[in-house]
Amino acid sequence: MPENLSSALETFKQQRNAAEAHYLKANRVSVFFREYTAAVETLLAALWAEHFQNSALCLMAVGGFGRGEPYPCSDVDLAVVSPAPLSDGIQEQIARFIQTLWDCKLMPSVKSGSVDELCESVRDDITGDTAFLEARFLFGNRQTADELAEKMNVQRNVAAFIEAKLVEMEHRHAKSQGSGAVLEPNIKSCPGGLRDIHTLLWIAKAQGLAANLPDLLKQRILTRAEAGMLSHGYRRLAHIRIRLHLNAKRAEDRLLFDLQPQVAESMGYQDENRRRQSEELMRVFYRAVKTVKQLGGILTPMLRSRVSSTPVRVTLRIDDDYIQVNNQIAARHTDIFFRRPEHIFKIVEIMQQRNDITALEPQTLRAWWGATRKINRSFYQNSENRRRFAGFFRSGNGLTQTLRFLNLYGVLGRYLPAWEKIVGLLQHDLFHIYPVDDHILAVVRNVRRLALDMHSHELPYASALMQSFEKQDILYLAAFFHDIAKGRGGDHAVQGIADARQFAADHFLTEEESDLLAWLVENHLLMSAVAQKEDIQDPGVLDAFCKRVQTHERLSALYLLTISDIRGTNPKLWNAWRASLLESLFHAAGRCLAGNDGNPHALFGRRRQEAADLLTRAAVPEKQQKKLWNALGSAYFARHQSREILWHAANLVHDFEPPIVRSRILPQSDSFQVMVFMPNGPRLFARLCRIFSRHGFDILAARAFITEHDYILDTFIVQIPSQHAPEDYPDIQSALEAELNSFIHGHTVAETQSCNRRISRRSRYMPIAPSITITPEEDYPDRYSVEITAVNRPFLLADMAEVFFAHNVSLRYAKISTLDERVEDSFTVFSPDLKNPKIQSSLKQALLEQLA
């Protein structure tokens, strides 16, 4: 590299470092962009002079660099423009110039050609056309640059350009769906991200308006409040993107789990109020994109309407204050929301009631949103406003869209201060994937879908139950309030009771409705916890659950709320296994509340009799049946449900001496039920678990039982790996049975801890602290409940079983609740030694070491 270029490169590095240092000190986005742009242009000037002295060509900045918005590791977008077609010699010259840019580590993205060639190249290329919309002259022949800009502007069909950018934005938003996009969002392309702000400015510039927010304010396209809020949202997002590049040392636009703590720390966020610094960062991010979405929803239709051909305008009178224009509602006088604030909810009420109205007319929306920022205590205390807000839930029609609309524009948070505290609040607990406010609205949506016949095919039984439930509005409110106290520290279910009762008192709910609402908020986790963590075949567990529930109305409401909550937490959590657990508990509790299962001994006797009837129909002699029941023992009927007993009995009754493996695919599910019957021996449970883990199965539930003649009868529910299609299940079943049969007949089975599953980035960088509780069971001497919460990983249950064995603890029952990347396991164990605090402490420490 010539000496003069080496000097220019060194100067560039110094200026770039100075720009970064000034930014980190002053924390001003505009200063960084200005100084970094100047540094790049200084280097480009030297390179241009070296390669194109006295040339007819010109160099233009396009795209983000043309906009004056260069991020630390982004491409430098350039165009080399010629007044005439490029000769071979000029093309070689341009190639050498581009290579020098790479040598200087500028990461160039360069277009080159004549004016006509470049115009033709972007005729059907919306991305290229957009890049040249940002073009600005740098060096060389200015006349050529002006000619290109003029021809581009003449060629561009403004209306078509705007429509194409809006379609592009829709596609971009559609790609930003799913848990990955929520948890590790792309700062640039996510809904409400930087690209949405750019799109707004491109639409403005394409029609001859200013291309920046201050000038759009001067042109009265934006109000002062709109310009201020949009600028604030833009600066927040730009800060995050700059810090992301600086910490990643690459052009990384996704807030990856491993980068979130680094970016948060560099921006000065601290762990506080039991929230991680990364959660604080993500909350700032979600609020910023929400602001951009708010203003985009108002400003984009307004800018579009300035140039788009208007469809035939159909206007209908609604009442003295409102008209319908096509599918939108418009206020006759937009100052009505300031003069008569009760219309802030009235217009939403009309929109909710009318299926032929889908939106507010842009100018009406703008005025309405401006008025909503005046919502205060006086507005809340107005009885008409309270009646209308409660009416949104009583109506049910369009409830999800109504609440999402009110949340997007900040109305829920202004009307209910408790709601404002959860907006954008993300929980790094390895199973929630949405901010709390979005999760709550997803749960409301799920409850509402159960009430609509058009969605009954999704969950037929739950839908039928919901459609016959009298107090649907209370269920919607329970979904709305169930997590409203998240993030305050302490038990959010208990803390939410006060919010729910205050709302009920203020919004004309009866005492009975208030009691049901408060009970559902307090107990919204009860059914999930019992179904997924406890042995519902144990009459004591069922009795305790029913004492909490007390009525069939509460049971039905809790069942419906629980289903909707799980489905709204993380799409991966809802599966046939969880559905069957909840349904089993619902029906068992229903019988218990009706008084049909009040006597445990009668229940156990009925289970035995059902199995005996089956065997009798199969012509099994009574003497043979009796031998089987004696071998299994009376405790067997207390520990297994009827369907398991029938399955076991059919397979064991003819000969219960040889080892047996049986499996069956559970109906409408991606799970197998597996039974293993063999002579008792050391570490059998752990070794069986390792076989399942090596095959990639998740163990959902396990029941370890020892017969009277010292055989194990272990029953597992295992989930088939998601990459397998249902048509593969029989082959998978055969392979699993073959290995298990080899094991039970004494053949050596490898115990290597190898499987293809990898721990996710989220688990590695956002782990949860493992926790263990050991509690004696009151009615059963030497029996203990062990509760474990930890990051999910292969072989976890096998490792836990090894620890139990090493401490002389007998595992009787395991209930595995896998919540995406988090597990909440419940074990019932037997050990006289655990009365000794030292031994109990030793067990706990050993378990923690395995979980670390």
From Swiss-Prot:
Cofactor(s) essential for the protein: Mg(2+)
Gene Ontology biological process terms, A to Z: regulation of nitrogen utilization
Transmembrane intervals: none
Organism: Neisseria gonorrhoeae (strain ATCC 700825 / FA 1090)
UniProt keyword annotations, A-Z: Hydrolase, Magnesium, Multifunctional enzyme, Nucleotidyltransferase, Repeat, Transferase
Chain spans, region Uridylyltransferase: 1-318
Name recorded for this polypeptide: Bifunctional uridylyltransferase/uridylyl-removing enzyme
Gene Ontology terms for molecular function: [protein-PII] uridylyltransferase activity; phosphoric diester hydrolase activity
Gene: glnD
Region (Uridylyl-removing): 319-672
